Amino acid sequence: MSKSGTKITFYEDKHFQGRHYDCDCDCADFHMYLSRCNSIRVEGGTWAVYERPNFAGYMYILPRGEYPEYQHWMGLNDRLSSCRAVHLSSGGQYKIQIFEKGDFNGQMYETTEDCPSIMEQFHMREVHSSKVLDGVWIFYELPNYRGRQYLLDKKEYRKPIDWGAASPAVQSFRRIVE
């Protein structure tokens, strides 16, 4: 485990079997060590794991825990190639603003809590811009924390491309807490 207490282990086979690769820092390309990834054990920290090298492709956020099959982290397949530790803010404060239009225009909603459905909670169909005032958050493209994930640190996001999305399809979001 690193000095910061972060550690993740990737396994080629389900249920933590087969070849494995241990990592305690950001890694832009580990697919040369493993041909596939079917299970993961996060022993310290929260991690963002990516389908392609250089932190590209589908991203999955994994807090401490065991993931015996790729479906347990909502993976689409057994391909992962890069990872990075998620650095959580100190103090445990969380606050986010979401906007119905780009560049912080239109109706704005502010919350400090997780939201399983922006349609039910805020009567919004999409999120076109956002300001993360405190904490680290995950946007999900579907309700109930499903679908593609996007990691948002403390900063301003004027349009969906700023958080890595091709469209404003955000239907739920939540805080990353340790």
From Swiss-Prot:
SUPFAM superfamilies: gamma-Crystallin-like. Gene3D superfamilies: Crystallins. Keywords: Acetylation, Eye lens protein, Repeat. Residues 2-5 are annotated as: N-terminal arm. Residues 88-93 are annotated as: Connecting peptide. The keyword Cytoplasm does not apply. Residues 6-44, 45-87, 94-134, 135-177 form the Beta/gamma crystallin 'Greek key' domain. Pfam families: Crystall. One of its GO terms (biological process) is morphogenesis of an epithelium. InterPro entries: Beta/Gamma-Crystallin, Beta/gamma_crystallin, G_crystallin-like. One of its GO terms (molecular function) is structural constituent of eye lens. The modification N-acetylserine is found at residue 2. Monomer. Has a two-domain beta-structure, folded into four very similar Greek key motifs. Belongs to the beta/gamma-crystallin family. Crystallins are the dominant structural components of the vertebrate eye lens. This is Gamma-crystallin S.
